[in-house]
């Protein structure tokens, strides 16, 4: 993406900023003039992304964060305001699949995570904590700062799994469905404050989280066959949607769900 001015003067927090969609969104926001505070639990990768942005002429800083920790959110929002005087954009991207990290390859389309009767309460709670509670805590923390700034944009990354079901991983579906409807509720509540809240629903995107599945040729083939445009999405595809919703071009867009899935859910 070429440099632009769509976010000049704006300050953004991007969670999950160390890799994949989060890292690309942080880069794109900075490329369009935003001052970016990116957060992640992976400090080494996060600092590397922030340094890359700064070395390219952008403005970025990194902070280690567990999005499930409410106190960390107060610290992050305060840091953004103290460093740059305001907060305009929050992009909640941090998320987990809930798959067993020891599985380095997905064996079939039905093993994208445990089936419902095999899913433990611990697994359920962890997925919901990161994917849903983290979004709630971030939104709650950002609202007062955005009110002080005269408005803002909150972008919550859900998934096509928040719209449709599948053979496995009910916790992931439930968490992403929660993000979808939570975003609509927040949009209605804070529209009078000129705070817009929208969700983005990626399809099969090539990221570190999806590579265990895509490493299996059969899984990759079936997913591509289910995608009318015939390719996996890239982090840049999703970052472009985040850029639009963060910009003033989307000033009349709130409570919406932006599906970026190569046509899969229309098929």
What residues fall within each predicted segment?
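Residue(s) in the substrate-gating loop at a strand-loop-helix junction
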Residues: 159
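Short, small/polar-rich loop/turn modules that mediate ligand/substrate recognition or access, typified
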Residues: 191, 196, 253-255
């Amino acid at each position: 993406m070429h440099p632009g001015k769509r976010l000049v003067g704006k300050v953004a927090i991007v969670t999950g900023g160390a890799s994949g969609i989060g890292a690309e969104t942080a880069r794109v926001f900075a490329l369009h003039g935003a001052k970016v505070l990116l957060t992640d639990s992976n400090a080494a990768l996060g600092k590397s992304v922030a340094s890359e942005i700064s070395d390219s002429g952008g403005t970025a800083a990194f902070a280690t964060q567990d999005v499930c920790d409410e106190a960390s959110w107060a610290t992050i929002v305060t840091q953004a305001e103290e460093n740059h005087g305001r907060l305009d954009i929050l992009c909640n991207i941090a998320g987990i699949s809930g798959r067993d990290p020891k599985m380095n390859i997905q064996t079939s389309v039905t093993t994208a995570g445990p089936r419902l009767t095999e899913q433990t309460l611990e697994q359920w709670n962890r997925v919901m904590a990161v994917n849903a509670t983290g979004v709630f805590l971030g939104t709650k923390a950002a609202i007062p700062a955005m009110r002080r700034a005269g408005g803002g944009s909150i972008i919550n990354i859900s998934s096509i799994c928040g719209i449709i079901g599948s053979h496995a991983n009910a916790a992931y579906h439930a968490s992403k469905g929660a993000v979808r409807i939570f975003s609509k509720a927040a949009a209605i509540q804070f529209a009078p404050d000129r705070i817009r809240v929208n969700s983005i629903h990626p399809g099969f995107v090539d990221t570190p989280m999806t590579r265990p599945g895509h490493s299996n040729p059969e899984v990759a083939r079936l997913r591509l066959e289910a995608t009318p445009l015939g390719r996996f999405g890239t982090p840049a595809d999703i970052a472009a949607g985040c850029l639009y919703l963060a910009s003033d071009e989307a000033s009349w867009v709130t409570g919406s769900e932006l599906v970026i899935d190569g046509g899969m859910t229309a098929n």
